[in-house]
């Protein structure tokens, strides 16, 4: 299991350890997250992360894209270092990390499975709200002209993807998540977030 945190691997590792069973648990702070974060942790719409995101845009790249690249390199390293011939990898992304994990799972040539905790169901939903508290660097510029998160989730498929307690544009639990998934066309196993914190079998919504 490889945890891709929302804001800090060290602070969020306990959320997944009990669900790991006999799996080895790894965690990574991608660029600008956790140990590599520039400035204090916490919401700051125009802080260091926004500045880094803006610099990448001026260079014709994206912070999200660079984080996906980072994660794919970590996945590659873990596979190279694995001693068991039957080694399989499960990505677990939370919040901002859930978006990165979803893209990385899609691009992974070994078809890693992915569990998303507090992921957005749709970036279109962000545009429909008066206020969105997700960081600007969590979305690709011009993405909605081509696809949205339900398309990404559909490409992964329910065999590889599970979503635990999706978040709204304000980064709070989606009310009536099952109905919202149906409305947005999200096809994935939908489960309660406490299933991860508590371990054991997840209760379906």
Show where each model-derived region lies.
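Active-site loop/turn elements of alpha/beta-hydrolase fold enzymes
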Residues: 30-32, 116-119, 166
